[in-house]
Regions:
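Catalytic-core regions of core metabolic enzymes
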Residues: 1-290
Length: 290
């Protein structure tokens, strides 16, 4: 078992023939990901990267049984692409696009929830189940197969955490980059819950940042559900000034509970093994697993 994606997943790329879609689809295919085709309206019937191109997601679902989609489209079109995927019956939608208008994203989010699909992102690096499926923009070589699940708001810190876990002789079950926008489809708590229910995941690394309540909500849920698996946590943005975004649109300290200090306090109170530097993640994981 893994979560969200594996070697059986049938993946399509929305924005397949564009420069971003082409570049990352090439990397995904080279990794061994089961990319079954892509969607670019007006180019249906062509082939690209030796895969079929479809005009619509519905055609892709009908003809190649696609069940997972990754979206590489400009912000103005991405929310519609999410809703098109859901309407066509896609179960897991991974949205890389940054800067989708909040109003568009609110509609798409409500649509996804109403239909029971799973949305990862937007503004995320994607999801990787090592040695099975890389559905995103992450460097695949950093990830080795194992029993540690990673959930992170940050792309680069996902790669850093994986590199450290692997350097300890351990590996990753699945890594989920949930995204750094204010409105995202899968929260920290949602992702942690997936790992808690995954028999192959024995430890969870939870990486958050200033702004919002996602990490506190996840920590309280972990405690309420009985701390079934060890969780190692890190919060980025310790030195961020109040009222300034730090890299991500959602990374902004509004109230006193949004600070790194407050989040880390809540996480510790809930039994999470919190580290103060990303450089300590790997060693802490090895420690709690021993």
């Amino acid at each position: 078992m893994s979560v969200l994606v594996n070697k059986e997943s049938k993946i399509i790329v929305q924005g397949f023939t564009g420069s971003e879609g082409t570049f990352h689809a090439t990397q995904m295919i080279a990794y061994g990901t089961n990319v079954v085709g892509g969607v670019t309206p007006g180019k249906g019937g062509q082939t690209h990267l030796e895969k079929p191109v479809f005009n619509t997601v519905a055609e892709a679902v009908d003809q190649v049984d696609a069940d997972t989609s990754i979206i590489f489209l400009p912000p103005a079109f991405a929310a519609d692409a999410i809703m098109e995927s859901v309407e066509a019956g896609i179960k897991v939608i991974i949205t890389i696009t940054e800067g989708i208008p909040v109003n568009d994203m609110t509609k798409a989010f409500q649509y996804v929830k109403a239909k029971g699909a799973t949305l990862i992102g937007p503004n995320c690096p994607g999801v990787i189940t090592p040695e099975e499926a890389k559905v995103g923009i992450m460097p695949g070589f950093v990830f080795k197969k194992g029993k540690v699940g990673i959930v992170s708001k940050s792309g680069t810190l996902t790669y850093e955490a994986s590199d450290q876990v692997v350097s300890q002789g351990l590996g990753i079950s699945t890594a989920i980059g949930i995204g750094g926008d204010p409105i995202i489809g899968t929260t920290t708590k949602d992702a942690v819950e997936l790992f808690m229910n995954d028999p192959e995941t024995e430890c969870i690394v939870m990486i958050g940042e200033i702004g919002g309540q996602l990490e506190a909500d996840a920590a309280k849920w972990i405690k309420a559900s009985g701390n079934k698996k060890p969780v190692v946590g890190f919060i980025a943005g310790e030195t961020a000034p109040k009222g300034r975004t730090m890299g991500h649109a959602g990374a902004i300290v509004g109230g006193s509970e949004d600070t790194a200090e407050a989040k880390k306090r809540i996480m510790r109170e809930c039994g999470i093994h919190v580290v103060d530097s990303p450089a300590q993640i790997g060693a802490k994981v090895a420690e709690v697993l021993s």
